[in-house]
Amino acid sequence: MIGTDENRAVLHVEVIFWSGKRKIPPSLVSGKYCPHFVVTGTTEYLGVCFLDGTECTFDTPALGNAQPLYPDTIDYAPLENNAEFLIYEGANAVGKGRVLGRTVPYKVKQQRKWVPYVPN
């Protein structure tokens, strides 16, 4: 699955950030919040970056879209639909979440380069 379009799928997630773990909730809309997801029952850190989402408040569900950061080197298959995960910043678990769905990037068909016909 590494390097495939399926591994590049944007993840639609529901997340909850716990109070007492951060001073303020993260901004999911800045495009700069890049935590790790660790799927329940595994230990592998899966780096993601939030593209957008709803405003976060502590201990309340928020919705967001996250993109895998390393689709060419790490297998993101464990983040399948309904997978539950913890959200880590470094070694600290700051929240939890669940995958609601995935959007695989649309494959764009290559256009043929037009070359004018030149008779001999």
Q: What are these model-derived regions, one by one?
A:
Residues 1-120:
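C-terminal effector/interaction modules appended to NTPase cores
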